[in-house]
Amino acid sequence: MAQIKITLTKSPIGRIPSQRKTVVALGLGKLNSSVIKEDNAAIRGMITAVSHLVTVEEVN
């Protein structure tokens, strides 16, 4: 299965609590931190919820 790299580009400060919890659940802490996750429906849904805070790119 493909993998994706998720990078936190904007701060979750001032966002609604569910968006802040989603950022933490993705494993992102500080700005510009990145994680590599499996590309599946659950992760894609989380990315959609915070798409204005993160950038996503595919990893080969």
UniProtKB/Swiss-Prot annotation:
Q: Which domain of life is it from?
A: Bacteria
Enumerate the Pfam families for this protein.
Answer: Ribosomal_L30
Keyword vocabulary terms for this entry: Ribonucleoprotein, Ribosomal protein
Molecular function GO labels: structural constituent of ribosome
PROSITE patterns in the cross-refs: RIBOSOMAL_L30
Please tell me whether the keyword Ribonucleoprotein is annotated for this protein. yes
Q: Which GO terms describe its biological process?
A: translation
Q: Which CDD domains match?
A: Ribosomal_L30
What Gene Ontology cellular-component terms does the record carry? Answer: cytosolic large ribosomal subunit
Q: Which PANTHER family does the UniProt entry name for this protein? A: LARGE RIBOSOMAL SUBUNIT PROTEIN UL30M, MITOCHONDRIAL RIBOSOMAL PROTEIN L30
HAMAP family xrefs: Ribosomal_uL30_B
Family of this protein:
Belongs to the universal ribosomal protein uL30 family.
Quaternary structure and partners? Part of the 50S ribosomal subunit.
Q: What is this protein called?
A: Large ribosomal subunit protein uL30
Write down the species.
Streptococcus pneumoniae serotype 2 (strain D39 / NCTC 7466)
Give the gene that encodes this protein.
rpmD
